[in-house]
């Protein structure tokens, strides 16, 4: 059977409930989400773990509260995928993705950090690792968009998760957050967030691509994320592009037996 979902918080300063764990076969429950306008601190609940033999991890809960983080995705069992991390809407970090199955399975994707009101630059959650023999790493979440003057600049993207031990690609790094939103007439100063780094591949597989730097509203240079490297057979990930003349990320190294190096970011 599956684990139960964590309770949601419709409003107020409280954390969402954690999702329940499955036992032998079944998926973990999703973490509870926190809603309403930001009136306090309330983190998204963590996802439950999948069953020991087979089952996906539950997704982390999301939050609309300020200074609060999205929940972490649950870990998979022997076979299954890790849960995705929850997003954070104001001044908080996206939740990390859960790990893939201990034999076969993909890591969960990291949650996004949507925007900052100017106090904290939230970063995207890191993608979960594939910890078994076969599976891909999860993608990193996007960094927060800068909308305030107290902490100028966008948030950094999350790093991609690593591929499985034998066969698997590294996850892509998340993109950095911008400092100019189309609906905002006056650009916010500062560089866009740094792109996340791509994950490392398994023995066979490609490294993840680095995330792009966020777009700056005033032309401040921003940096792209580095591409992940391959190990034995596979191509290195491409570096993420920089912004406003900032450096792109370096390309990852190709496999020692066969593979090409990733291209540097422009």
Task: Show the residue positions of the predicted features.
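Glycine-centric low-complexity repeats
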Residues: 1-266
């Amino acid at each position: 059977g599956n684990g139960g979902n964590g309770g949601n918080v419709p409003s107020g300063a409280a954390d969402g409930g954690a999702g329940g764990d499955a036992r032998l076969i079944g998926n973990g429950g999703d973490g509870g989400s926190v809603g309403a306008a930001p009136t306090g601190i309330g983190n998204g609940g963590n996802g439950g773990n999948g069953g020991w033999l087979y089952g996906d991890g539950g997704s982390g809960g999301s939050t609309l509260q300020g200074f609060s983080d999205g929940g972490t995705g649950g870990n998979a069992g022997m076979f299954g995928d890790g849960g995705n991390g929850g997003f954070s809407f104001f001044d908080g970090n996206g939740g990390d993705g859960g790990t893939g199955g201990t034999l076969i399975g993909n890591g969960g994707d990291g949650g996004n950090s949507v925007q900052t009101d100017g106090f904290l630059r939230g970063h995207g959650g890191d993608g979960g690792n594939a910890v078994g023999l076969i599976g891909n790493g999860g993608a990193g979440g996007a960094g927060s968009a800068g909308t305030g003057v107290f902490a100028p600049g966008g948030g950094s993207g999350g790093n991609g998760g690593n591929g499985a031990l034998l066969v698997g690609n590294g996850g892509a790094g998340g993109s950095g957050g911008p400092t100019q939103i189309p609906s905002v007439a006056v650009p916010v100063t500062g560089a866009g967030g740094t792109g996340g780094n791509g994950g490392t591949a398994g023995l066979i597989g490609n490294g993840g691509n680095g995330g792009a730097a966020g777009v700056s509203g005033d032309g401040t240079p921003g940096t792209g994320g580095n591409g992940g490297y391959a190990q034995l057979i596979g191509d290195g990930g491409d570096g993420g592009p920089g912004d406003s003349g900032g450096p792109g990320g370096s390309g990852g190294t190709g496999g020692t037996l066969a593979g090409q190096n990733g291209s540097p970011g422009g």
